[in-house]
């Protein structure tokens, strides 16, 4: 079991990266160096460095600047919509890095909640995706208005549903795997469930509180997202799988695509 100070360093670097966007590349480099060094000496903190590095990598990928056409509404219904493709490419990079870290540590997907799911579990996840997605798509703009101001989005164009689903599933798969998969599970090893839940929720909330076009203070967004992180974490621990958190998260992300890629001129 690593010492408290030693085990706390990667978490401090993670929270710094989440709160201060310009620090993310530097914190990612520090965490990768820490991961390589701790793997070489077979230190138990290797899992912490690996988990935190993967989360910061997802933040960096999510923050990559997109072309102007991604947000002007002109590519809203295109299957090649940049807003969807950029996120899908980032998700593939992050999930590939997750596989690499798992292999380096001799771990398996089942250890982080990536496991075979029963037909009943698949049906539940699909049902949640459809039900929550429909509700979120039509009431999401109204709920988001206090945080981001009016969102003049076009929701009636069903041809935009395919790129919206691509964006939503890619983003949810990436974030749930790193936050509720590796981070939650591996922080639990050294710090226990309560600290792990708090750490992943805090990082999740802080990461969503920077770089946005907020109508006022970002603090309500940070708080709401952190509460969402707690809920997703509880579901992941309760079910032992990431499929239901991914489905619900993806459903909630569908209106985010519309709000960013389908803005009216």
Can you name each region flagged by the protein language model?
Residues 70-91, 96-171:
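Juxtamembrane helix-loop-helix connectors linking adjacent transmembrane helices
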Residues 1-106, 257-265:
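N-terminal, membrane-interfacial amphipathic/helix-forming hydrophobic leader that caps
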Residues 37-50, 111-118, 184-189:
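Membrane-interface helix-boundary motifs at transmembrane edges
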Residues 7-29, 126-265:
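Transmembrane helix-loop-helix hairpins at the membrane interface
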């Amino acid at each position: 079991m690593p010492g408290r100070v030693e085990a706390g360093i990667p978490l401090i670097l993670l929270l710094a990266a989440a709160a201060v966007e310009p620090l993310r590349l530097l914190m990612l480099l520090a965490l990768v160096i820490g991961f390589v060094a701790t793997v070489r000496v077979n230190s138990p903190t290797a899992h912490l460095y690996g988990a935190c590095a993967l989360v910061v990598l997802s933040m960096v990928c999510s923050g990559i600047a997109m072309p102007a056409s991604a947000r002007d509404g002109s590519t809203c219904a295109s299957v090649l919509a940049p807003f969807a493709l950029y996120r899908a490419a980032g998700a593939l990079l992050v999930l590939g890095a997750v596989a690499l870290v798992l292999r380096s540590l001799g771990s398996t997907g089942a250890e982080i909640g990536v496991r075979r799911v029963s037909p009943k579990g698949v049906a539940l996840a699909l049902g949640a995706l459809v039900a929550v997605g429909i509700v979120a798509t039509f009431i999401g703009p109204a709920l988001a208005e206090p945080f981001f101001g009016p969102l003049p989005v076009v929701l009636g164009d069903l041809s935009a549903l395919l790129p919206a689903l691509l964006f939503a599933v890619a983003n949810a798969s990436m974030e749930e795997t790193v936050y509720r998969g590796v981070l939650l599970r591996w922080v639990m090893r050294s710090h226990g469930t309560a600290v792990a839940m708090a750490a992943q929720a805090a990082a999740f909330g802080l990461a969503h509180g920077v770089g946005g076009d907020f109508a006022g203070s970002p603090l309500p967004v940070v708080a709401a997202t952190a509460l969402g992180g707690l809920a997703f974490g509880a579901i992941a621990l309760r079910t032992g799988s990431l499929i239901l958190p991914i489905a619900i998260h993806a459903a909630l992300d569908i209106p985010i695509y519309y709000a960013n890629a389908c803005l009216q001129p």
